[in-house]
């Protein structure tokens, strides 16, 4: 009886844990839908008054209709949001606006000052925002002077948490890890023959989608599972011979960390990624000519497992034949 009671309690605990995982993954979008009817603005604390006005204009601020209080990202706020040491000398110029979109609208990111966001592209921001748990929203980024743009998402985290979203530190870390990986790999390969930033962004979207599907069908993924999903996807997009082995390992490490995240439990995660993929492909001209856009990394993983299983069975049958 005690054993049955223990098993029942364990089952309830597992069910509650699963529900909490899904809730954590969808909480961000719920807050956006309920709170961001009016857009919210987060400005870098290093802006002068003139730069502040210039940035607000770029972001589309309208004082007569945008009545929510402006937020400021200070070094102290940044350290708390990002869980890093407080550095009072930190210069923060990147600013952002976030507003809700209809539930049928895809996630949008627009950089209003592309000449000043030197390292991060709109699609990189979109990929990282999906990892954070954003499904449909419009994010606008601007800066009055050249900056890398890697800290711009911190303003979004700040705004979301100030409005009640529970954003797990692990999800913020993953989004930042992804943003850094994408921007670094892009910068290091920008002028390399065969490299295409659109392919990298779509490949990463497929990798994340493949991880989510594989985890749903298999449960916890091994490092070998994750490595296969990454390597097969990069090969499909003809990036495996373009980016370096070290860069591939950076993507594998990110994918391995993501494979342990609750965000993969979100039912809308793969749909949001597919919307992102279709959006990039539709605007990429001939970048994806002769590329299999229906590639399924999870299916490739299943096929690989079936092949190994068949190979093992063939070996067993071979040795059995000697004993017959």
Question: What is the role of each PLM region?
Answer:
Residues 1, 231-324:
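Charged, long alpha-helical assembly modules
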Residues 4-13, 24:
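Sec-dependent N-terminal signal peptides
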Residues 18-32:
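Sec-dependent signal peptide cleavage junction
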Residues 29-102:
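Extracytoplasmic strand-loop-helix segments at the start of, or within, the mature domains
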Residues 35-41, 101-111, 133-137, 187, ...:
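Acidic/histidine-rich, surface-exposed loop or edge segments in extracytoplasmic proteins
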Residues 39-43, 109-116, 139-146, 190-193, ...:
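Second-shell loop/turn segments in exported
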Residues 79-134:
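Signal peptide-directed extracytoplasmic domains
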Residues 130, 135-241:
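Soluble oligomerization/assembly scaffold segments of membrane-associated complexes
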